[in-house]
Amino acid sequence: MIYTVTFNPSLDYIIDVEHIKLGLVNRTVREIIYPGGKGINVSIVLKNLGFDSTALGFLAGFTGADIRTRLETMGVKSDFIEVSDGMSRINMKIRSDEETEINGMGPAIGSADIDKLYDKLDKLKEGDVLVLAGSIPSVMPGTMYSDIMKRLEGRGIDIAVDATRDLLMNVLPYHPFVIKPNNHELGEIFDVELRTRDEVIPYAKKLQEKGARNVIVSMAGEGAVMVAEDGTEYKSEAPKGKVVNSVGAGDSMVAGFIAGYLSTKDYEQAFRMGVCTGSASAFSEQLATKAEVDALLAATYK
């Protein structure tokens, strides 16, 4: 079974406004609302690709109830923990002459809530896959993901981590199955600027030396690279298409890689699946569908 964890789920509210004017009443010309959060995005894309998962995390208030309902409508299973203090956040993206994002705070997650999450994670079994994705609330320690991995260490659970900075670096001693920084995040870790696939590879290997089994680095229009646990290096140009909405593209890459690996047990095929799934989401207003991914696979890797 696949499980995803999202510490701070959201309702993502995207509005289009023609020539927004601050300080005045503006009217939208288009609105979209959908459940958000990196782990949730992974679960949605996995479902689109034909793989069931269970979305874990924390919900609160009427917004939390709406997130749960929307996921149920999509056919995504969930087992969220209800938090009593606050409400799940609303993240607003205003698209006009420029794009502006306003992100909500989210509920107050206490130690008792964390213990409930641990209780759920303790039930995972050998062969399960766990995805830890996204940021955590600022009140939580930067060891949150590594604490989870330490707790599950030695149980045969493959753990994917999509996080940044300390949250990512702290998990490396526990040998995550796959990590997926982008080239900018990777550069920030080592205080360098990484622009090309060849420049990225040595630094991806440094993360592998620190403990990661497989390292994928996404590079938007420059494609992606992967260093597999057997030492093989894979490089891919970006699939051709027009970027419509890049939100969720990285999460989609993680979902595609997991789906590809579970289907084939082949790292090259899984990497290609990840690349095309990420691009398919970027080329669409919504998250990638299987038909979109299959079309990109056929067009990109002839």
Question: Predicted regions: what is each one?
Answer:
Residues 2, 51-54, 78-79, 159, ...:
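Hydrophobic anchor at the start of a short beta-strand
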Residues 142-230:
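Conserved phosphate/ATP/ADP-binding segment of small-molecule kinases
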Residues 1-56, 64-66:
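Glycine-rich phosphate/adenosyl-contacting loop at the front of the ribokinase-like
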Residues 108-123, 127-152, 158:
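Hydrophobic alpha-helical segments and helix pairs
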Residues 24, 48-128, 295-302:
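Conserved N-terminal subdomain of the carbohydrate kinase-like
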